[in-house]
Curated annotation (Swiss-Prot):
Signal peptide: 1-17
Single Gene Ontology BP annotation: proteolysis
Single GO cellular component term: extracellular region
Cystine pairs: 135-178, 169-211, 269-322
Site (Ancestral active site): 138
SMART domains in the record: Inhibitor_I29 (SM00848), Pept_C1 (SM00645)
Known glycosylation sites: 173
Taxonomic lineage of the native organism: Eukaryota, Metazoa, Chordata, Craniata, Vertebrata
Annotated active site: 276, 300
Protein name in UniProt: Testin-2
Main subcellular location: secreted
Location in or out of the cell: Secreted
A molecular function GO annotation: cysteine-type peptidase activity
Amino acid sequence: MIAVLFLAILCLEIDSTAPTLDPSLDVQWNEWRTKHGKAYNVNEERLRRAVWEKNFKMIELHNWEYLEGKHDFTMTMNAFGDLTNTEFVKMMTGFRRQKIKRMHVFQDHQFLYVPKYVDWRMLGYVTPVKNQGYCASSWAFSATGSLEGQMFKKTGRLVPLSEQNLLDCMGSNVTHDCSGGFMQNAFQYVKDNGGLATEESYPYIGPGRKCRYHAENSAANVRDFVQIPGREEALMKAVAKVGPISVAVDASHDSFQFYDSGIYYEPQCKRVHLNHAVLVVGYGFEGEESDGNSYWLVKNSWGEEWGMKGYIKIAKDWNNHCGIATLATYPIV
């Protein structure tokens, strides 16, 4: 049913009568399709090939402009090459803001000094990059990421936690399978539930199923959670003093879909149009410290083949670029 729906959307976005294909790209197309295990019926293949070619040429143009100094990051073809941007955003994001009770607010004025560089991966706070698949469940991965870090801080043990536990057990009043959710609601669930299962005991599948939580498999708990004021300075202090922080960003753009490396700056990014949840695990500079080369180090949940082995550097101190500081939060354990 989902495949049929997206094919219908695709036909509306592309002239499906007879898309003109570029035979000079036959080799690249076949190599890409083989690498990613893509198989289509006859009608769909022409449409998907047309989308892929459009994306391929857009990436090529961007990278030429990068060499000319017009951009600070590169793009590359990846597993999302046959998706239109509309499809991509619907299938691969997953942040949906919802009502939540009043919560504690991070008191950033208490911290006067913070280091210039932070990378919590180096101190053991961060689990390997995960993959949400074609499911808008980024909120669950962002929530487990910050909770994994706080549990490591408390216990000295880094244990991957179960996103599937969240998808299956939170209830339709809070989230709906692969249709998006909110990290604070995930923290509230863990608090009310008295725990969250390990990934090993409750592995990720995707679309929600019957809840199968068992308390004996819990490896985390939440006492409360904290909202960080929507300023980059406050987020910087929280990342430095607390650990990995759950945030939401605007990931609506082709440039995010095909990000490869470098400091991501997208002029069309919005501070309030937030649709994708990620995890800030640090910050720093590329090269010498100067205006324009600072970044947030962000863990994504699209597998290690995307971006910088699953990570992206988002422009820092650029007026809250892509809304990275707008809705930042972490759990108290």
